[in-house]
Amino acid sequence: MSASHPGILHEYTERLVAFELVGKSNVTLTSNVTRSLLLFVGGLGDGLLTVPYVQELVNPLDEIGWSIVQVQTQSSYIGWGTGSLKRDDEDLHKAVDYFLHIGGADFSTRKIVLMGHSTGSQNVLYYLTQSILPNYLIAGIAQAPVSDREAAYQFNGKEKTKELVDWVKAEYLDKGLGNDVLPRSKVENFFGEVPTSANRCIDLTDVRGNDDFFSSDLSADDFAKTFGNLKEISGSTAHSQLILLMSERDEFVSPSTDKAQLLNRFRESIRPTTSNSSLSGIIPGATHNVGPKSSPEALKWLINQLITALRSFIDQ
């Protein structure tokens, strides 16, 4: 559906932009140094305004003094095929630094929460647990944190996925060709028409690949290296909060997966335990991106949960 959306397009670093959607109050991050920010990053194939619920968050967040900004990274649209979580992290840190200081704000006046959808959830977890760069996020929110590897198993079969992994390792990684783009004929059933490097293919489809954070067959030791490693907020003794919001009817999760049990495993792994938000949960009736095929209550539940979370962060 065609539509126009009022807002401000920020060039947060050379050739990369972020779109600040402006609500009814017309208050912006530039005009108010105390205004807090929900920085949103989508999943594979997403770009500006491609996740349907983002626009629905603008006015509810505006009413409690928050702005929502959707960030474009080098991995947006089809860029993910030759990208990595490390490159995404560098882009996201540049965006956080930009918005932390725009309009004369600083760390003491502006609070920032990073929210990721789908593979954007990997960006959130990487930022909070593995990044070597400073952490100025008071919280991370992962919506539809799903396993890309298990999604590949679901749609292409476990054996075919393993065959692809073995072939890529033998023909590319073992020969030092990890940055080379794979032949379309070999990967189109997995990645469509997106040019995909050997490294990114392995990141997404191999057991314990660099993107393999949310698979149900990972061990407690695996989760301890990610969920169990939340970093302190820079300049503080406090740690960032982590909120996990799974979709009840997520089409990219196998019907045989017990989402409630998996969510509990994630949460039980979070360290320090003070970072384990009680607001994590399963969005009732929600599809992967809480889109039109979701139940009517899904979007309302998501908005209410986010409002509750963001209000609680103001007092921290």
UniProtKB/Swiss-Prot annotation:
<dbReference type="Pfam" id="PF08538">
    <property type="entry name" value="DUF1749"/>
</dbReference>
<keyword id="KW-0539">Nucleus</keyword>
<dbReference type="InterPro" id="IPR013744">
    <property type="entry name" value="SidJ"/>
</dbReference>
<dbReference type="GO" id="GO:0005829">
    <property type="term" value="C:cytosol"/>
</dbReference>
<comment type="similarity">
    <text>Belongs to the UPF0613 family.</text>
</comment>
<dbReference type="GO" id="GO:0005634">
    <property type="term" value="C:nucleus"/>
</dbReference>
<dbReference type="InterPro" id="IPR029058">
    <property type="entry name" value="AB_hydrolase_fold"/>
</dbReference>
<protein>
    <recommendedName>
        <fullName>UPF0613 protein PB24D3.06c</fullName>
    </recommendedName>
</protein>
<dbReference type="GO" id="GO:0016787">
    <property type="term" value="F:hydrolase activity"/>
</dbReference>
<keyword id="KW-0963">Cytoplasm</keyword>
